[in-house]
Amino acid sequence: MILFITLPLLNVIISGLLSRYIGVNNIKRLNIINLFIILILLIYYYINIIKTDNEYTLKIIEWINIEYLNINYSFNLDLLSITMLIPIILISLIVNIFAWEYMKDDSHNPRFYTYLALFTLFMIILVLGDNYLILFLGWEYIGIASFLLIGFWYNNIDNIKSSLNALFINKIGDIFFIIALIYLIYIYKSLNYSLIFSLVSYINIDINNIIILCLVIAASAKSAQFGLHNWLIWAMAGPTPVSVLLHAATLVIAGIYLLMRSSPILENCPNILLFNLWLGAITSLISGLIAINSNDIKRIIALSTMSQLGIMFISIGLSSYNLTLYHVLCHSLYKALLFICAGTIIHSLNNELQDIRFMGGLLIYMPITYICMLIGSLSLMGLPSLTGYYSKDIIIESSIGIFTISGLIIYWLVVLSSLLTNIYILKLIYYSFINIPQLNKYIYNSLSLNNTYSLPFNFKFNFDKSWMAIICMIILSIGSLFIGYLLQDIYLGQGNSINGLFIYPNNLNLIETHFAINIYYKWIPIFNIFISILLIIYLYEFNYKLLYIYNNPLFYNFYILFNTRFLFDQILNNYIIRYTLYLSKSLNSLLDKGFLYTLGPNGLNYLLNLLSFNIIKFNTHLFNHYLIYISFSLLLFIYLQFDL
């Protein structure tokens, strides 16, 4: 188990300090080999934990021991943490393979691989930590690593702005996380999971509400929920491997993991569960409305991530943490697949174009990418028998299974969100691969020269040139096809308990979802898929003029509202970030460079000079003055010595 920490740490040290001596390619090989070793060990532990229902604990040192507060630097491996680790390590491995070719022409590869290794290391620490302090340590460092990765190409001002945006919004969540830690220390006198969770039912519900609300806000910032979601959209400024790493299965699920790990506290706070339910539904719907009016290929996929994160919040609000964990695992596979396909397209177009309206006709030149993109998209849509169907549809159905008015409204909101998801992901495929070619003819000539291979008898065929990307896409495509079916009994099977999760028996609604709800509610998400396919074919092939409805003043205003992302960027930049930066500058000038500087360095320097100048005045070179000084000193010594 110690290898889960030491091997990524070795990657960080060697990539950061020794790359100039052993070469960049050797750094890449070492990172891939170490991650592959960790993945093999994880699969071994995963099978063992499923068979025996064991947990593994590793205590390294005693970290803090102050009066009643005792915190160890220790790690715990249970079914919750290992299920989170598998997509983290798998996607990190895929990203390292994909980046080998994608970033081969970049002159700062050692720095890039150092950041990747740093991010992976602290994601592992976050998930394996045995207390909230270690979780917070990993939480902070993945925020720093994501800031460095998003702003990796720092010569572009947009990248710097995007990385700062991500940093500022995540710091809002970090502040609330710190408040929650202070409350936990004050109320529970500990930060250890086992002690807190054993006492939670004896603590006043209002106090628990405050603690878990702070944790929910922290999770909302990290997992891009409505109101704190802006950074996710702008994080696309980084290299595509960074987008895969951050938005598929790592950074954005840190908040989801925090809430799943805190499930014993959440279960004692029904009002916060209801808040999570509505927050997830609104996030899912808002992301769909924004994405359907977006045309950037990476931004559309990022918004689909935001939508799926909203669905995960819904499942948390339903107390269906096993469904949340299952969806995290399944979603990471097809979302990473979509991002890698998008990166392959952008890379093939010489990194010059991300607007899908100016693509088209790529099916002929990139058939493997098209097939893999189609698999990932259909899995995202929830086509029966694919991975996304098994994890996504059961969450949508579970909102009906609680048999409340809120559940019914949430169900229809998520159904509408799913319809929007289906439409914009099909729109992406149509514009990129099927539409009439819109690119410059020289780009198509370049694609034809690079992607055409000859066979005997003058037979030629087109094939994707990027072999590294093809390997990654095939691996993820297999996962997107079969993992959902293969693992459903582990997470959805009756009687299976997941170590690390706690659900009140009254909140178990999976049986009602399976057997009590009307069959029509189960079929509606599937009908959504066929409705969206027919709608896309009708609009883009037979009645394109219908899209001119945007020229209508009413619809145009809605289009502007959705296209400007509900003006959240303007509100955030003009009224929050700008005034926050102004306040920090004022406080820096008033306190740090003003009051404290005057009392500190300047004040101390002035006081010492004044004191030394006055002491010099006693040096009169007169014997009687020296005799008085000696006599006074002797009397003072006698007084202090004998306590007169």
Swiss-Prot record:
Topological type in the membrane: Multi-pass membrane protein
Domain of life of the native organism: Eukaryota
Alphabetically ordered keywords of this record: Electron transport, Membrane, Mitochondrion, Mitochondrion inner membrane, NAD, Respiratory chain, Translocase, Transmembrane, Transmembrane helix, Transport, Ubiquinone
One Pfam family recorded for the sequence: Proton_antipo_N
CC annotations in GO: mitochondrial inner membrane
TM ranges: 4-23, 30-49, 78-100, 112-129, 133-155, 167-189, 199-221, 234-256, 271-293, 300-322, 327-349, 361-383, 398-420, 466-488, 517-539, 546-568, 594-616, 623-642
A Gene Ontology molecular function term of the record: NADH dehydrogenase (ubiquinone) activity
EC number: 7.1.1.2
Any Gene Ontology biological process: ATP synthesis coupled electron transport
InterPro entries registered for this protein in UniProt: NADHpl_OxRdtase_5_subgr, ND/Mrp_TM, NU5C-like, Proton_antipo_N
UniProt keyword annotation of NAD present: yes
Record's catalysed reaction(s): a ubiquinone + NADH + 5 H(+)(in) = a ubiquinol + NAD(+) + 4 H(+)(out)
Record's subcellular location: Mitochondrion inner membrane
Functional note: Core subunit of the mitochondrial membrane respiratory chain NADH dehydrogenase (Complex I) that is believed to belong to the minimal assembly required for catalysis. Complex I functions in the transfer of electrons from NADH to the respiratory chain. The immediate electron acceptor for the enzyme is believed to be ubiquinone.
NCBIfam families, sorted: NDH_I_L
Family designation: Belongs to the complex I subunit 5 family.
PANTHER family membership: NADH-UBIQUINONE OXIDOREDUCTASE CHAIN 5 (PTHR42829:SF2)
Protein's recorded name: NADH-ubiquinone oxidoreductase chain 5
Species in which this protein is naturally found: Wickerhamomyces canadensis
Species lineage: Eukaryota, Fungi, Dikarya, Ascomycota, Saccharomycotina
Gene: ND5
